[in-house]
A protein has these predicted regions:
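Short, charged, surface-exposed hinge/linker loops at domain edges
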Residues: 1-3, 32, 36-73
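Short aromatic-glycine-(Arg/Gly/Cys) micro-motifs in beta-strand/loop hairpins
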Residues: 6-19
């Protein structure tokens, strides 16, 4: 699965977001700073979502396995 980053130049620098991941957005003074901030935002969102899911399933009989979405892309 590939994610799409969108960057928009604004008067103070750049804003960036990920089309496929609501809530993954950021700001930076430069494009490179914005790219790095966006990578960090995505990592934090995924880590947080995993931790929340694990805590909700704590003690439950669940099956956890890797998922390769959309034909292995």
């Amino acid at each position: 699965m590939k994610l799409t980053a969108i960057y928009k130049r604004v008067s103070e620098g750049y804003v960036g977001f990920v089309e496929e991941l609501p809530g993954a957005n950021t700001f930076g003074s430069t494009l490179e700073e914005t790219r790095e901030n966006l990578r960090e935002a995505v990592e934090l969102i995924l880590e947080t979502n995993r931790a929340l899911a694990e805590s909700e399933m704590d003690g439950a009989d669940v099956i956890r396995e890797p998922l390769v979405p959309f034909g292995g892309e």
